[in-house]
């Protein structure tokens, strides 16, 4: 019997480890509550976070990256949460873990978007922060996003793996005194900050539809909307982590049915849909057609380059050729980079770029401490569309120069071998291994990237004609799926 109990306990322990390891990802911690992420684990993560920030490993990592070590011996962490139903209890357990490890916590009052959290962390000069959110994931998920000083993201390569290791080891040193909790409301300061990104006098009367998806973005846009001459049709502005109307992920077609319909019903000029934690935002023209994130990167870049001629703009390698063309035409220097917020933010700081944009509708801005904000992007785009004083579809039309496949997933067990096979097949093209494999030819290109969490390869392909795009899309897919 003792052997059976031993085997059962060992099996249960290994299952627990597998569950823990599955939630520590490339950019954040994210899992299903409470099966994968619960209060006990949140407490351990709080202790592990403070332990890591004060470790020699972190100090050495900073030295290698060329950063200052002066903020070590971290004694203060900003913690915020979005509207998810599990957020309150996870936040409380996380805070207890942080304070039990000797650091003070500045707890931001109320529901908070990720952009507002970044603002709080940066403006309060916090040496570190944690945002409790699962971004655009369904309601049963929750998670944590980590930053160090200046709201700089901590990724898998710069700390999340170390935090995971500490959680698994579960051996934390006792501290002489516990930290305290300081509650803080930054809403008034945040409102003043947001108004820096739009000039109300340059916004003409327009009718717009905003679907907040019961996330945090609607309430935060309301801080500024009353200053603008807009007729705003508000949809699902009440924060509700059960997402009673649809998931707060506007990337999926089923979640934008309502806003598309409302735009047409109201004869609106355009539509705006932030995701759950408002780090992303999606735009729709007067016909209810969703506008690709790379097109919006081009338009925002064009506007920002007016005051920053010759500046560098980062765009992700899934973007249309037209993105770089638009940036060059506007007097900027386009820089292609890999997908992922931590990678783009790091690159922006490295090359002093003023803007980074992803096809997935993340927009990162130097004047917003190199972080992504769906709120600020929305304000900038409202002014852009207003100043152009044309139908939004007419503004976007010149950007639809090429034909794109969209992202297509294929199940592949040996992802690395398949990408090498593609590189060999298309060796006459210009090959880049920046993020997966991207191969450019004169009249078409494709990128194949591996999923971080699943046995999937993701294909994006573009060509100078629809016929060529369809031909090459089918050709490459057949090779991937063979």
PLM feature segments, named:
Residues 127-135, 139-141, 263-285, 290, ...:
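Glycine-rich phosphate-binding loop
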Residues 109, 161-192, 196, 286-359, ...:
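Proline/glycine-rich low-complexity loops and linkers
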Residues 142-266:
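Gly/Ser/Thr-enriched, mixed-charge loops and adjacent short helices
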Residues 306-482:
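Phosphate-binding and adjacent anionic-ligand microenvironments
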Residues 17-96, 100-101, 183-206:
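An N-terminal, well-structured beta->alpha segment
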Residues 66-67, 71, 76-142, 195, ...:
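N-terminal small/polar loop signature for handling phosphorylated ligands or for N-terminal nucleophile
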